C-alpha cells in the first residue's frame, strides 16, 4: 500500500513539473515574507473571520506565508512553532503533541481536548495529532495568542492556529518542491496544479506530497530505526463562482501517516542524550485522515455576507504491537485501534449596518464520535505460581455534541477608535460507553454550558501606530478517563486573559508588543497514575488546580536596506501553579514544583535573509535562523525533587540560488548538533507502575543537511 501511495504522489508531482509549459503565466519566487500580501505590500489576515491588515487587527497574531514555510523547510504546524512568539509545541510520537500558548491551554495527552485550537480553512481539528500532519499547499499560517472563544469556540483558551491553504487560481499554476537531507535519509517531494476549468466560473486545485525519514533513534535490541516517519498526502479543491456575489468551494483530502509511538530511551538523567531504544517491538503506528468540506459564501446585498461551512473528518489509527514497559523486559504489550469521526456545521452573517457599526453573528454545531478497542497483555512472574499473563480488552465509545451561538459588534465612533464586544455560548453533552473484557460498565456522562465574552478597545493614533487593550474568557471542555480508571470524568478548565498591546508598521519596519496576564482555573495538567479495574495501573487525567501566567512578548521585522530583512520574536512568560489542592485531593500526592510541565519561561527566534542580485531574474539568498527555548519541567510524579531540562538554542542556515521560477538551495539545520530533549518522563512514573525504574527521554533531531529545489509557474 505504501508503494502504491508513493507512486500516486510521484506521478502527480512529475506531471506538475513536466506540464509547466512556457505558455503558463510566470510568477517569480518572492522573498519570504511574513504573510499573504496585497499589491502594495500590506499584510492581510483573517484573524477575526474577516479580511483585515495585520497592523490594524487588535490581536497578538503572527502570520507566516507559504513561501516562508518552503524556504525554511517547515513541513508541519509543530515545526512552524519556532517562528511564532509564545507558541510551544513538543511531540513524543507520530500522533501525539504537547501544545500551549503563553503557558495556557497546556495539552499533554491526546485524550484531553486541545487548549489551543487548530483550524484548517476555518474547520476545527479536534485532536493534537493534527499538529504533526504534513502541511500541503499552504498559503499561510496565522497564530492568534490569547483566548479566541468568542469567534472560534471552545478549546481556544490559549489561542488558535489558522492554516489557510491555497485556493484554485484563475490562471494555470504549477508548483513543485523537493528536498533531500542526511544523515537520516530524509526527503520530501510535493507538487500542486491549479487553473480554470470554465473561465472564472469553475476552477480546480490538486496537490500531493510524500515525505519520509529514518530519524535519529535506533532500536538496539532489534537493530532497526526507532523513530522513522512516512507520510503521503493528497487534496483536491473545486471552486464554483457562477456570479459575482456567490461562490461554493468543495475540498477533499486524504493523509496517510506511518510512524512510531513514544520512542523513549531509558536514560540516567536529563543530561544523558542517548539515542538507543530497547523495545521488544518497533512500536509502529499508522494513521489515516480523510475528509470533505464545503464552504458557500453569498453577498446578500445591503452590506451583509452569509457564509456556511460544513465538514466531515475521519481519523483511524492502528497499533499492531506496542511495548508498554519501555524496555527489553517483556512485561506489557498492547494492540489497539481507534477512530475519531467529526461532523461540523457553522453559519455566519457579517453585516455592515452603518459606517460606524457592523456585526458578525453565527451558530455552530459539531458531533464527535470516538471508538477505541485496546488489548493489553501483562506478563508477570508469581513467586509461587510462576509466569502469569493477564489479558484485558477495553472497548469504549464516546460521543459529544456541541451547540453554540455567537456574536460580535464592532463600533467605530470615529476613524481612530474601535470597540469590539463579543459573546459566545457553548453547550456540550458528552457520553461514554465502555466495557472491560466483556463486562459492560455504567455509562458516564458530562455536560457543560459556558459563556465566553471578549471586549477589545483599540485606537489608531497615526496611520502607522495602533494600541489596544482587551479582556477575554476562554474555556476547554472536560472529558473521560479510560474505562479502567477509578475516576471516569474530569471537568473543563478556563482562563480570563487581560492584555495590552501596540503595533507600528511603516516601510521597512514592523513592530508589535504585548503584555498579558492569565487567570487560569481548574487547570488540566499533568496526569497521574491510579489502580486500574481488573488489575494493574492506569493513567488518569484530572484538574490540578489554578495557574497564574503573565509576561511580555515582542515581534519585529526590520529591513535596514532593500535587500536585507531581519525578523525576530521573544516571549517571557511566568506560568506557575498557585493552588494545587485539586491535584493533592484527588491523588493524595504532592507536586515537586509549581512549574507547568514542558513549559519554558522564554521562547525566542531571530532570522535574517540577504539577497544578492546577480542580474535579470537571478539572485542569491543567504538565510540563517536562531531559535531558543528556556528551561522546562519534565513530566514527573516525584513528590520532592523536580527534574529540569536544560535550555537550548538551534541554528539553521541556507544559501539559495534563484533564477526566474526556479530555486535551488543548500541547507543545514541544527548546525552545531545541539543536544536537547523533545520529551522527558522522570522514573517515578514507571516505579509507581511496578515497572523497572528509569528516566525516559526522547532527544531532538541532530544536525541535518541537504539540498532543496522548487519550481513555480
Give the positions of each predicted feature.
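N-terminal Sec signal peptide and the immediately downstream disordered periplasmic leader
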Residues: 1-84, 194, 244-245, 292, ...
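N-terminal periplasmic accessory domains that precede
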Residues: 77-78, 98-100, 116-119, 143, ...
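Structural signature of Gram-negative outer-membrane beta-barrels, strongest in the C-terminal barrel
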Residues: 239-243, 253, 349-352, 364-366, ...
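Transmembrane beta-barrel wall of Gram-negative outer-membrane proteins
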Residues: 173-175, 181-213, 217, 221-259, ...
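Membrane-embedded beta-barrel scaffold of Gram-negative outer-membrane proteins
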Residues: 190, 293-323, 460, 466-472, ...
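C-terminal beta-signal and adjacent terminal beta-strands/loops
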Residues: 521, 626-637, 656-713
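Gram-negative outer-membrane beta-barrel transporters
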Residues: 360, 412, 418-419, 517, ...
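Short acidic/polar hinge/loop motifs at secondary-structure boundaries
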Residues: 121-147
Amino acid at each position: 500500500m505504501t508503494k502504491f501511495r508513493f507512486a500516486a504522489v510521484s506521478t502527480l508531482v512529475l506531471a506538475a513539473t513536466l506540464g509547466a509549459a512556457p505558455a503558463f503565466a510566470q510568477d517569480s519566487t518572492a522573498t519570504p515574507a511574513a504573510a499573504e500580501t496585497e499589491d502594495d505590500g500590506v499584510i492581510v489576515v483573517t484573524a477575526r473571520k474577516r479580511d483585515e491588515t495585520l497592523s490594524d487587527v487588535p490581536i497578538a497574531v503572527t502570520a507566516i506565508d507559504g513561501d516562508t514555510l518552503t524556504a525554511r523547510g517547515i513541513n508541519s504546524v509543530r515545526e512552524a512553532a519556532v517562528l511564532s512568539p509564545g507558541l510551544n509545541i513538543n511531540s513524543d510520537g507520530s500522533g501525539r503533541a504537547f501544545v500551549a500558548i503563553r503557558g495556557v491551554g497546556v495539552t499533554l495527552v491526546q485524550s484531553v481536548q486541545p487548549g489551543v485550537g487548530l483550524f484548517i480553512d476555518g474547520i476545527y481539528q479536534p485532536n493534537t495529532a493534527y499538529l504533526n500532519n504534513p502541511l500541503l499547499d499552504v498559503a499561510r499560517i496565522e497564530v492568534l495568542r490569547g483566548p479566541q472563544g468568542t469567534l472560534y469556540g471552545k478549546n481556544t483558551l490559549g489561542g488558535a492556529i489558522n492554516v489557510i491553504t491555497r485556493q484554485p487560481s484563475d490562471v494555470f499554476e504549477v508548483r513543485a518542491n523537493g528536498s533531500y537531507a542526511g544523515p537520516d535519509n530524509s526527503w520530501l517531494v510535493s507538487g500542486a496544479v491549479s487553473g480554470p476549468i470554465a473561465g472564472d466560473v469553475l476552477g480546480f486545485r490538486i496537490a500531493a506530497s510524500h515525505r519520509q525519514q529514518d530519524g535519529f533513534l535506533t532500536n538496539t535490541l532489534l537493530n532497526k530505526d526507532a523513530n522513522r516517519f512516512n507520510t503521503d498526502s493528497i487534496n483536491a479543491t473545486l471552486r464554483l463562482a457562477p456570479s459575482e456575489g456567490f461562490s461554493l468551494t468543495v475540498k477533499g483530502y486524504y493523509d496517510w501517516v506511518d510512524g512510531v509511538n513514544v520512542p523513549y530511551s531509558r536514560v540516567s538523567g536529563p543530561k544523558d542524550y542517548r539515542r538507543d531504544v530497547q523495545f521488544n517491538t518497533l512500536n509502529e503506528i499508522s494513521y489515516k485522515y480523510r475528509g470533505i468540506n464545503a464552504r458557500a459564501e453569498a453577498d446578500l446585498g445591503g452590506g451583509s455576507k452569509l457564509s456556511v461551512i460544513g465538514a466531515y473528518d475521519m481519523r483511524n489509527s492502528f497499533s499492531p504491537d506496542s511495548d508498554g514497559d519501555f524496555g527489553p523486559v517483556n512485561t506489557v504489550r498492547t494492540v489497539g485501534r481507534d477512530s475519531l469521526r467529526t461532523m461540523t456545521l457553522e453559519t455566519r452573517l457579517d453585516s455592515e449596518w452603518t459606517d460606524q457599526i457592523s456585526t458578525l453573528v453565527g451558530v455552530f454545531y459539531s458531533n464527535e464520535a470516538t471508538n477505541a478497542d485496546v488489548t493489553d497483555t501483562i506478563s508477570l512472574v508469581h513467586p509461587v505460581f510462576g509466569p502469569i499473563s493477564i489479558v484485558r480488552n477495553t472497548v469504549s465509545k464516546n460521543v459529544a455534541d456541541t451547540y453554540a451561538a455567537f456574536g460580535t459588534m464592532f463600533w467605530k465612533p470615529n476613524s481612530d477608535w474601535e470597540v469590539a464586544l463579543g459573546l459566545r455560548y457553548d453547550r456540550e453533552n458528552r457520553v461514554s460507553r465502555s466495557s472491560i473484557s466483556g463486562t459492560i460498565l455504567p455509562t458516564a456522562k458530562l455536560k457543560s454550558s459556558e459563556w465566553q465574552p471578549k471586549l477589545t478597545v483599540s485606537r489608531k493614533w497615526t496611520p502607522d501606530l495602533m494600541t489596544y487593550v482587551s479582556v477575554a474568557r476562554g474555556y476547554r471542555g472536560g472529558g473521560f478517563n479510560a474505562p479502567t480508571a477509578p475516576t471516569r470524568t474530569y471537568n473543563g478548565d478556563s482562563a480570563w486573559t487581560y492584555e495590552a498591546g501596540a503595533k507600528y508598521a511603516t516601510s521597512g519596519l514592523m513592530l508589535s508588543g504585548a503584555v498579558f496576564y492569565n487567570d487560569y482555573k481548574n487547570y488540566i495538567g499533568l496526569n497521574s497514575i491510579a489502580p486500574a479495574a481488573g488489575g494493574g495501573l492506569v493513567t488518569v487525567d484530572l484538574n490540578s488546580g489554578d495557574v497564574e501566567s503573565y509576561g511580555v512578548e515582542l515581534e519585529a521585522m526590520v529591513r535596514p536596506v532593500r535587500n536585507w530583512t531581519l525578523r525576530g520574536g521573544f516571549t517571557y512568560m511566568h506560568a506557575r501553579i498557585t493552588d494545587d489542592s485539586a491535584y493533592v485531593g484527588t491523588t493524595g500526592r504532592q507536586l515537586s514544583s509549581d512549574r507547568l510541565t514542558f513549559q519554558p519561561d522564554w521562547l525566542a527566534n531571530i532570522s535574517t535573509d540577504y539577497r544578492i542580485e546577480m542580474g535579470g531574474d537571478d539572485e542569491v539568498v543567504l538565510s540563517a535562523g536562531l531559535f531558543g527555548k528556556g528551561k522546562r519541567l519534565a513530566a514527573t510524579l516525584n513528590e520532592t525533587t523536580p527534574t529540569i531540562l536544560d535550555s537550548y538554542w538551534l541554528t539553521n542556515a541556507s544559501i539559495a540560488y534563484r533564477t526566474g521560477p526556479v530555486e535551488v538551495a543548500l541547507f543545514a539545520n541544527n548546525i552545531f548538533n545541539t543536544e536537547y530533549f523533545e520529551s522527558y518522563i522522570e522514573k517515578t512514573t514507571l516505579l509507581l507502575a511496578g515497572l523497572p525504574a528509569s528516566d525516559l527521554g526522547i532527544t531532538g533531531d541532530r544536525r541535518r543537511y541537504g539540498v532543496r529545489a522548487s519550481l513555480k509557474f
